[in-house]
Amino acid sequence: IYGEHFQGRLFYDKKSLKAPALIIVSGSEGRIEKAQNMAQLLSSRGYICLAVAYFGLEGLPKHLERIPLECLVGAKDYLRQHPQVDSERIGIYGRSKGAEFVLAEESLFNDVQCLVLNSPSDVVYEGIKGKWNSHTSSWTHLQKELSYQKFRLRDYLFSKLFRKTFPKDCSARIDVGQIHSPILLLGSTVDEIWDASSAIDDIVSHYKGHYIIFKKYHETGHMLTVAYQPNHRYRKDWRLLMKESKDSWLATIHFFDRH
């Protein structure tokens, strides 16, 4: 599927009629493979699933910088026009930078049934250009960059040395108060990429909708992946890692089934 601002792959049962739909958005690895893996799994449960790529494929931005929020708007419009989709039952799953992307977009266009955010951020961070910071925002709206938290080596080293979070730039905070869709938040208290745990706390405290739940894990870090898949990133007892990944996956399934 080739949209104006996104590319995607759709997974669904051809016999489906007015089925609920999900948009799957992965993180800073780009391309589509990880989103596609999850879309395939969720489609087996009766959802029409659109795995979305927003950079890293031919025809899309090369790097994670200045990605238009209109990417997700276009993905939602595509699903609403699909004859087999129930346009009133569309949810979004985002993980890592994808969760940040989804939260930023939904703070302006809150028009889906529910959100699952895995290892989220509640601020817009600077973009990534290869292995370096891009000196631009990760996201744009109407071709204008969203205010963003700049990457400063001093802040990063301080957070690692003293195990304290560096202060967030207030102008870069995502306006969570504009979101009223039900939300499930998943994250780790030992996230090695960013402080997803405090982001979850801040999202919960600023949320003004009617239903938000969260689950925090203490063994698995940022890569809280699909259950039953090996996770060699962490040198910990595989049974503890699998228990957490299984719990987060079941929470995701049950949340989407409920909403």
Where are these regions (language model features)?
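Short alpha-helix in the alpha/beta-hydrolase fold that links the catalytic acid
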Residues: 38, 181, 195-206, 229
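Primarily recognizes the serine-hydrolase "nucleophile elbow" in alpha/beta-hydrolase
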Residues: 30-36, 74-143, 162-169, 178, ...
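Short substrate-entry loop that stabilizes the transition state in hydrolases
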Residues: 16-19, 24-61, 192-196
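C-terminal catalytic histidine-bearing segment of alpha/beta-hydrolase fold enzymes
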Residues: 201-204, 208-259
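Catalytic nucleophile-loop/oxyanion-hole region of alpha/beta-hydrolase
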Residues: 54-87
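N-terminal cap/lid segment of alpha/beta-hydrolase-fold proteins
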Residues: 1-17, 240, 244
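Acidic catalytic loop of the alpha/beta-hydrolase fold
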Residues: 190-194, 222-223
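Short beta-strand/loop motif that positions the catalytic acidic residue
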Residues: 179, 185-187, 191
